[in-house]
Structures are given as C-alpha cells and as structure tokens.
C-alpha cells in the first residue's frame, strides 16, 4: 500500500513537471517585454539633463521633509 502511494505521488509530480513551463533565467527581455527589447546598451543611456532634474526633484522633496520635521518638532516643544 505504501509503495503504491509513493508511486502515485511520483507520477503526479512527473505529470505536474511535464505540463508546467518555467523560465529559470530572468532577464529584462523575458516574457511579453521581449517583443520590443532594446539593444544591449540602450537601456543604460540617460541624458544628463534628465538625471539632474530627477536629482533636483529629490533634493527638493528631502528639503520639504526636513522643513516639515523641523516645524513639527518646534511646534511640539
């Protein structure tokens, strides 16, 4: 009885493995995104102006958080 249960479990596992598909290596070009995949070096190119505007926006938000924290601590004391 135990041998039969192990055999049935093995068959179920083999059928599950045979009917499923998996991709073991995940890259930026897997799945539906692969249709319009950029060339090898395209995904790392960014203009300096775009990077500077992102940096400036982040710095402005950090400054707002600092000011808000300072205002809150002054109001509580």
UniProtKB/Swiss-Prot annotation:
GO MF term list: hormone activity
Annotated InterPro entries: Adipokinetic_hormone_CS (IPR002047), AKH/RPCH_hormone (IPR010475)
Keyword Secreted: yes
GO cellular component, one term: extracellular region
Biological process (GO), any one: neuropeptide signaling pathway
Pfam families, sorted: Adipokin_hormo
Keywords: Amidation, Cleavage on pair of basic residues, Flight, Hormone, Neuropeptide, Pyrrolidone carboxylic acid, Secreted, Signal
Tryptophan amide PTM positions: 30
Predominant place of localization: secreted
Subcellular location: Secreted
Signal peptide: 1-22
Modified residue annotations for Pyrrolidone carboxylic acid: 23
Superkingdom in the source lineage: Eukaryota
Functional description taken from the UniProt entry: This hormone, released from cells in the corpora cardiaca, causes release of diglycerides from the fat body and stimulation of muscles to use these diglycerides as an energy source during energy-demanding processes.
Family indicated by similarity: Belongs to the AKH/HRTH/RPCH family.
UniProt-recorded name of the protein: Adipokinetic prohormone type 3
């Amino acid at each position: 009885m135990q041998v039969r249960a192990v055999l049935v479990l093995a068959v179920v596992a083999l059928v599950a493995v045979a009917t499923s598909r998996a991709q073991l290596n995940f890259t930026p070009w897997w799945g539906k995104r692969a249709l319009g995949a950029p060339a090898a070096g395209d995904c790392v190119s960014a203009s300096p102006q775009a990077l500077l505007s992102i940096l400036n926006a982040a710095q402005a938000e950090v400054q707002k958080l600092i000011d808000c924290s300072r205002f809150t601590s002054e109001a509580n004391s």
